[in-house]
Amino acid sequence: MNKFHEFDYYLKPIKIKKVLLVFLILILSNNLNFSQSLENKNILVVWGGWKGHQPKVFADNVIKWLKSQNAKITESNNLEVYDNYDSLTKFDLIIQSVTLSDISNNQADNLVKAINNGVGIAGAHGGLTDSFRTKTNYQFMIGGQFVAHPGGKVNFEVNMLNDQLTQGLNNIEIFTEQYYMHFDPNIEIIANTIFDNKFYPWIDGVIMPVAWKKKYGKGKVFYISIGHDPNEFIRYPDGWKLLTRGFIWACRN
């Protein structure tokens, strides 16, 4: 064995150890993402709008969980909380459940600016993607807009895709509204569904996002489209896990 080969022989175990160490760090970092809590994070929960989506039930369920995380919670059942930009920047995460409703230009601008500058935003169903239909700057920030739910409530499958937020989660066979979306190609889709031809033959086989995450400036956005009845997240535990993981992911570090 020459000196070069002798040196390489002793170096190989070191290289292998480094590779294993990097791999271990990656695994631990992924696990830490799931074990992180929202302790001492400033969370704003905003609810209201169309009562058919039971926004208070959604807010109550979320607030109960946030308390278990020892988060600092501010609750608002109107959009006046969006009046002041400086106040919004004090929050680490905004969880919104407001379907339809009207938002002023100032309120929409403040919200979008706050997300752009690092505040996170997350939500479910129409509480995030069927809000403020006339405000395209809001839609641009969220990454999508509800446009239809063919057949109303139907049975369909939510397919979990390969992502750290979906690790260990199973596909969900669910009975609820299957949201048809207009969405930004820039979103990172982490769960999807496939439409059939039962109600509109021309959408047969269309693959549609059910959950996504995205960046907007310095802020992060998480969305999941199930939850017409907020208690679906209780009946389908993997849906709840994905929702709460999304909250943690979107929250400002």
Map each language-model feature to its residues:
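Helical hinge/lid and interdomain linker segments adjacent to catalytic or ligand-binding clefts
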Residues: 42-46, 51-129
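N-terminal secretory signal peptides that target proteins for export/translocation
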Residues: 1-16
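Extracellular ligand-binding/catalytic regions of CAZymes and related secreted enzymes
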Residues: 37-45, 68, 202-208, 215-253
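Catalytic beta-strand/loop cores that center a nucleophilic Ser/Cys/Thr
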Residues: 66-69, 90, 147-223
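Short, solvent-exposed loop/turn segments at secondary-structure junctions
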Residues: 50-51, 101, 128-129, 194-197, ...
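C-terminal segment of classical bacterial N-terminal signal peptides
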Residues: 28-34
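Sec-dependent N-terminal signal peptides
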Residues: 19-28
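A glycine-rich, often tryptophan-bearing local segment used as a flexible ligand/cofactor-contacting loop or short
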Residues: 101-168
